[in-house]
Amino acid sequence: MAARLCCQLDPARDVLCLRPVGAESRGRPLPGPLGALPPASPPIVPSDHGAHLSLRGLPVCAFSSAGPCALRFTSARRMETTVNAHWNLPKVLHKRTLGLSAMSTTDLEAYFKDCVFTEWEELGEEFRLKVFVLGGCRHKLVCSPAPCNFFTSA
């Protein structure tokens, strides 16, 4: 499955949801098993998590028909450590992670396209590609090292 997601702001929960644009694969796929880990708590989304899909580094909720929880997608090349993470983020997105301001859906779409989608399509599989949770997601990440605590610290 190619990285084709659309940003949808859920005003009721004040979170950004990323939903698959279509079920068809486009562009270069990311091979390998999903290898989903069981959630730490009872799932808050339906169990149809799309285990047949082959994206690595995604939480279980990423393939739910209800849509994934609020996520930020980035590559390890752009964020080598959690210490310098804010230097690689647009200022408004950094503020959004700290709850200081909202970022428009258009700005977020541009950020995702520039930082992630182009990279996936041009370079293909990126072994060090990781997914970090902005907040509100209780699902474990697949193939992820130690949890990122940058977004929960002030």
Swiss-Prot record:
Subcellular location, principal: host cell
InterPro entries: Transactivation_prot_X
Organism domain of life: Viruses
Region Mitochondrial targeting sequence: start-end pairs: 68-117
Residue stretches spanning the membrane: none
Post-translational modification remark: A fraction may be phosphorylated in insect cells and HepG2 cells, a human hepatoblastoma cell line. Phosphorylated in vitro by host protein kinase C or mitogen-activated protein kinase. N-acetylated in insect cells.
UniProt KW keywords: Activation of host NF-kappa-B by virus, Activator, Apoptosis, Host cytoplasm, Host G2/M cell cycle arrest by virus, Host mitochondrion, Host nucleus, Host-virus interaction, Modulation of host cell cycle by virus, Transcription, Transcription regulation
GO annotation, cellular component aspect: host cell mitochondrion; host cell nucleus
One GO process term, biological-process aspect: viral genome replication
Location of this chain's protein in the cell: Host cytoplasm; Host nucleus; Host mitochondrion
Record text on subunit structure and interactions: May form homodimer. May interact with host CEBPA, CFLAR, CREB1, DDB1, E4F1, HBXIP, HSPD1/HSP60, NFKBIA, POLR2E and SMAD4. Interacts with host SMC5-SMC6 complex and induces its degradation. Interacts with host TRPC4AP; leading to prevent ubiquitination of TRPC4AP. Interacts with host PLSCR1; this interaction promotes ubiquitination and degradation of HBx and impairs HBx-mediated cell proliferation.
HAMAP family assigned: HBV_X (MF_04074)
Function: Multifunctional protein that plays a role in silencing host antiviral defenses and promoting viral transcription. Does not seem to be essential for HBV infection. May be directly involved in development of cirrhosis and liver cancer (hepatocellular carcinoma). Most of cytosolic activities involve modulation of cytosolic calcium. The effect on apoptosis is controversial depending on the cell types in which the studies have been conducted. May induce apoptosis by localizing in mitochondria and causing loss of mitochondrial membrane potential.
Family of this protein: Belongs to the orthohepadnavirus protein X family.
Name of the molecule in the record: Protein X
UniProt source species: Hepatitis B virus genotype B2 (isolate Vietnam/9873/1997) (HBV-B)
Lineage: Viruses, Riboviria, Pararnavirae, Artverviricota, Revtraviricetes
Encoding gene, per UniProt annotation: X
